[in-house]
A protein has these predicted regions:
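Sec-dependent N-terminal signal peptides
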Residues: 4-13
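Sec/Tat signal peptide C-region and signal peptidase I cleavage site
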Residues: 15-19
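Sequence-level preference for short, compositionally simple segments enriched
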Residues: 20-354
Length: 354
């Protein structure tokens, strides 16, 4: 009966003249949430499906040990009531830790949009040392947008798991310890907050933010006007995973610049030493430019082989290429985000009671 009422709710929201197709999740009901994902996958199976909105009220949606919950449809907008109040959480057993096994959500669709929610992976990271890979969003999709999405975990928090992917983040927050923004494709992070956590239970060890493995795209990870919050240990911007990793930090605000290690990027690569690692216009909390004039690093593999020497400070000429229209030549995520945010705001006002 509950399933029948759930489906009837979808039809009523469509029939009563709303411009958008909407599924409204029952407040705090994780079964209703899972039903919504399944129904959205059925309704929006076609890659050109009309936009479908899933509205999730503030609440704690506990998946328990369930992992890899799929968002398999296309052109789905998953809209919470607020970033801090709408929390989707899982807690995998530490025995299954792994980058492809633990995700809270696994996005598999094209054109999906996430807004105003938190994904939390509660795997017992410190009990899993030296490993503890616990993903919040494993994104195997294409052209995903995350707007005001918070991800709480430690290692491998966000995983762009599609070699040709294009994704866009804005005003989001990602927490972690090591390689906690990792994977392939071209991903633009606009005005996001990057927060490091303790690397180990006793606080020892350095943090590493990004681990790109750029292979079939050109640009890799672009962090633009982001803020790094680090109150715990020293850290690097990132390190090489494999193939031709690319990562740039543009106009970054460092709240604790003294904790950024001198090389700025980890000189030890995992499977490759070559890379395109750059920064430009780095600032302290008062907005003062603290970018070194030069920073030449000798990158090697972990065994000190295959040295690759590179300057990591970007020139103005290089900077001029970093525009969203150059990265995403046939997609305008900025325009799409504005449109979806406006539509979502109207739906939130209509369906969420303050």
């Amino acid at each position: 009966m509950k399933r029948l009422l759930f489906l009837l709710g979808i039809l009523l929201l469509t029939i009563e003249g709303f411009a958008q197709r909407v599924i409204l999740v029952e407040k705090g009901d994780v079964v209703s949430l899972l039903d919504a994902f399944r129904e959205a996958a059925r309704l929006n199976n076609d890659r050109d499906s009309e936009r479908l909105f899933i509205l999730i009220p503030n609440g704690y949606y506990d998946l328990g040990e369930l992992t890899l919950t799929r968002v398999a449809g296309n052109n789905i907008a998953i809209i919470g009531e607020s970033m801090e109040g709408t929390i989707i959480r899982n807690a995998p057993d530490k025995s299954i830790e792994g980058i492809s096994r633990t995700a809270v959500l696994q996005n598999r669709g094209k054109g999906n949009y996430y807004q105003d929610l938190t994904l939390k992976n509660d795997l017992d990271y410190y009990a899993s040392e030296p490993d503890g890979r616990a993903v919040c969003l494993q994104d195997k999709g294409f052209r995903t947008i995350c707007n005001r999405v918070r991800m709480l975990s430690y290692q491998d928090t966000y995983y762009s798991d599609n070699e040709k992917c294009q994704h866009y983040f804005k005003d989001s927050e990602i927490h972690g310890t090591i390689d906690f923004i990792c994977g392939a494709g071209d991903v633009w992070f606009e005005r996001c907050k990057i927060v490091t956590e303790k690397r180990s239970r006793d606080g020892s060890g350095n943090n590493i933010i990004a681990a790109p493995r750029t292979s079939k795209t050109k640009w890799g990870y672009i962090f633009n006007r982001c803020t790094i919050v680090n109150d715990v240990s020293d850290y690097y911007y990132g390190r090489s995973w494999h193939t031709n990793p690319a990562c740039v930090w543009l106009y970054t605000t460092l709240l604790t610049p003294e904790k950024l290690l001198p090389a700025r990027y980890d000189p030890k690569g995992m499977k490759t030493s070559s890379n395109y690692f750059k920064e430009y216009g780095t600032m302290d909390a008062k907005g003062r430019n603290i970018t070194p004039k030069t920073n030449v690093v000798t990158f090697t593999l972990r065994d000190d082989t295959k040295p690759f020497v590179a300057e990591t400070i970007m020139t103005r000429e290089e900077l001029s290429k970093y525009k969203t229209k150059n990265i995403f030549t046939s997609w305008n995520p900025v325009k799409q985000l504005k449109k979806l945010e406006k539509q979502s705001r109207k739906l939130q006002k209509k369906h969420f009671k303050n």
